[in-house]
C-alpha cells in the first residue's frame, strides 16, 4: 500500500506536467515566426486557436467519425494516426497523442501542412469568429 500512493500521484501529476494552457501572449510569442504564413495574420491565428482549443494543448474533441487533438485541434481522420481511426491518411506522419504535450513544434509543422492544403477555413471558428475586429487578439508585449 505504501508504494501505491506515490505511484498513484505520479500517474496523476505526470500528464499535468506535459500539458500546457497558454496565454494569448505566450502563444503569440511562439507563433510569431508564422505570422503571414499562407496569408494569415497572427491575430487571426491566435483568435482561431482560442475558439478552437482555448489555448489548451490537451484539448480533445470527439466527433462522430473522428477526434481532434491539441492546441490546433488536428483531426485523426486525415492528419494524424490513432487507434480510433487506423485507416487515417496520417498526412502529418505523426501519432495524434504528440499533439497533447507542451512541445508544440510538431503541432505547428502539421498546422502549416493543413494551411497549405486546406487553408485557414479548415478551422471552422476562423470564418465565424476571426475575420474582423482582430485588434483584441494582438499581444501588447511583442
Swiss-Prot record:
Gene3D superfamilies from the UniProt entry: 1.10.530.10
Pfam families: Lys
Residues noted as binding Ca(2+) 2 in the record, renumbered to the chain: 98, 101, 103, 106-107
Sorted UniProt keywords: Calcium, Disulfide bond, Glycoprotein, Lactose biosynthesis, Metal-binding, Milk protein, Secreted, Signal, Zinc
GO molecular function, one term: lactose synthase activity
UniProt cross-references to SUPFAM superfamilies, sorted A to Z: Lysozyme-like
Localization per Swiss-Prot or TrEMBL: Secreted
Cellular component aspect of the GO annotation: extracellular space; Golgi lumen; Golgi membrane; protein-containing complex
Keyword presence, Protease: no
Binding site for Ca(2+) 1: 57-58, 100, 102
CDD domains xref list: LYZ_LA
Tissue occurrence: Mammary gland specific. Secreted in milk.
Signal peptide location: 1-19
Domain spans labelled C-type lysozyme: 20-142
Superkingdom assignment: Eukaryota
Disulfide bonding pattern of the chain: 25-139, 47-130, 80-96, 92-110
Biological process per Gene Ontology, one example term: cell-cell signaling
Binding site for Zn(2+): 68, 135
Glycosylation sites: 64, 90
Family assignment from sequence similarity: Belongs to the glycosyl hydrolase 22 family.
Its biological purpose: Regulatory subunit of lactose synthase, changes the substrate specificity of galactosyltransferase in the mammary gland making glucose a good acceptor substrate for this enzyme. This enables LS to synthesize lactose, the major carbohydrate component of milk. In other tissues, galactosyltransferase transfers galactose onto the N-acetylglucosamine of the oligosaccharide chains in glycoproteins.
Subunit structure: Lactose synthase (LS) is a heterodimer of a catalytic component, beta1,4-galactosyltransferase (beta4Gal-T1) and a regulatory component, alpha-lactalbumin (LA).
Protein name, as recorded: Alpha-lactalbumin
